Amino acid sequence: MTKELLLAVCLLPAVFMLHGFEEIVLMQPWLANNSSRIQARFPRLAKHINHAAARSTSAFALAVAEEFILICLVTALSVWYSSYGVWVAVLCAFILHLLLHIGQSLVLKSYIPALATSVLLLPYCVWAVLLLVRWAQFKIWQICLLCILGIVLVAVNLLLALKAADWFDRQLDKYKAGHK
C-alpha cells in the first residue's frame, strides 16, 4: 500500500466527523425553521420529520458518535490486517450519504444541514476511490459490490443508532423529570 492510499484510508474518520459536526450543530435549528415547509411539500414524510425534529441534539450526537466509533474501528482493522474490503464498503456508503444530502438540497431548493461538507468532501471521496482502483487493485465491479454491502450495513447500523438515540432521549427525559 502506498503512503498516499494509507493517508486516504486513515483520513476517513476525520472526514466523517467533519461532516457529522455540521449535521450535529445545524440539524435541530434547521428542522425547527423548515419542518413545516417540508411537511407541506412532502406530506408522506411528516411523521419522519416530526420524529427527527423531536430528537434532541444530544441524542443525535450519540448516534453520530456510534457511527464514528465504528468507522474508526473499521479503519484501524483495515490498516492492521491490510484488508480493505469493509473499509471500501463504508467509504461507498459515505459517498452515497453525501450525494443524498446534495440531492435533498436540490429537491428542496435550499441549504440543508451537511450540504457544505457534502460538497467539500466529495473531492476526497473521488481521490480515495481513484487510489483504490490504482493501488489497491480493486476493480470497478468489486467496488460496486462492496458499495451494495456498505449500503446495507450502514442502513442497518443507522436504524440501530437512531433507535439508541431515541432510547437515550427517553432516559434523558426521565432524568430531567426526576431532577425538578
What are these regions (language model features)?
Residues 92-101, 112-132:
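Hydrophobic alpha-helical membrane segments
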Residues 12-19, 93-100, 153-154:
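Alpha-helical transmembrane segments of multi-pass membrane proteins
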Residues 80-84, 102-112, 135-137:
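Membrane-interface helix caps and helix-loop-helix hairpins in membrane proteins
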Residues 24-53, 167-180:
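Cytosolic, membrane-interface loops and tails of multi-pass inner-membrane proteins
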Residues 19, 45-65, 104-108:
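Membrane interfacial helix-start motif at the N-side
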Residues 126-180:
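Terminal transmembrane helical module of multi-pass membrane proteins
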Residues 58-77, 120-126:
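Core segments of transmembrane alpha-helices
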Residues 2-28:
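N-terminal signal-anchor transmembrane alpha helix
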